[in-house]
Amino acid sequence: MQQSTGAATSSAADSGMGATDLVSRCVGDGGGGGGNSCSGGSSDPAAINTTISSKQADAREPQEQQVAIHYLASFHELCVVTALLPLVTLFTCFVTAYVFQYDDVHETHCRVYNIIPSISAITGVSPQRYFWRFSIALHIGPRIPIAFVYKNYYRSQLRRISPAQVPQTSLLITLILVLNCIEIASLGGVTYISNRENYPVHERIFITFMVCSLCYMLATIKLNGILNAGQALSEKQLLSIKWKKILFAVSILSTVGLLVFFAKHRFYCHDLAFSWFAFFEYLIAIANMLFHFTIIWDFPSQFMMIVQGPRENLAQYLSNRPKLD
């Protein structure tokens, strides 16, 4: 009786193994596509699994595109070129206009003695005006993305401060972005609408530029004080904050001097009053350029790149990159 039961069990087991082997051969041969694919012979389960995995990988391959970097530029070098371009152009316009067009750039409505032409004068004559406008066009292009880079950089620093300070600090970051964008737009306006073409509009745009520039400097210094309070800063960060404060002080003092001598020239026509006005105007312009030049200490080793790839792959790629501190 026991032998009969054992034989039956063995027969059932053999039958089950045979059925499993048959199904495996059918799957491995593509569901019975060949003449003997399901009728005898042996099939290797490892080979079957390898074949199925290979087919699945082939099906996924078109969807899993790799992230490709098409352009990679040093953010440091980009900022250096952007900041120095108007400074070099301004110097070139000053020298060439002073040497070759002396009478044109020194003419004023008071007809008084003058030795230093204003920025509007040296960039309003031809061909300097075209050179200046071309350089400002190249300068403004990178300024817009740099403004948003600063916004994202400041937002990444919000974790340093207490939660109670975050809402007001976020508003300050947004204010800095708006002031920066208005300053950039005003720079374009005061460049392309010269005082000789439309003096009232040129004057109002210049005032807008001055106000936004000073407010931007002050707000940036205030924000750095909030974000860096109680933090251990690097030498470059300390240098950046130090020069921002110095250049803001120079801008404030120069603005006071500019207003005083503008009034003396406009209402009293004093000799050399316009020259002093122009002198302080140059100081303001140079201080503004150098203030933005401090970005080389804020972003000493970052890069700007153009990347191609699916959004999910790009997000995963960027999530593995080190974040800004």
From Swiss-Prot:
Superkingdom of this protein's organism: Eukaryota
Broad class of the protein's primary localization: membrane
Residue ranges of the TM segments: 80-100, 130-150, 171-191, 205-225, 243-263, 276-296
Protein family according to the UniProt entry: Belongs to the PGAP2 family.
Membrane topology, from the record: Multi-pass membrane protein
Protein name (database record): Post-GPI attachment to proteins factor 2-like
Keyword Membrane part of the UniProt annotation: yes
One GO biological process term: GPI anchor biosynthetic process
Organism: Drosophila melanogaster (Fruit fly)
Keywords for this protein: Membrane, Transmembrane, Transmembrane helix
One Pfam family here: Frag1
Subcellular locations according to the entry: Membrane
PANTHER family, alphabetized: FGF RECEPTOR ACTIVATING PROTEIN 1, POST-GPI ATTACHMENT TO PROTEINS FACTOR 2-LIKE
GO cellular component terms given for this protein: endoplasmic reticulum membrane; Golgi membrane
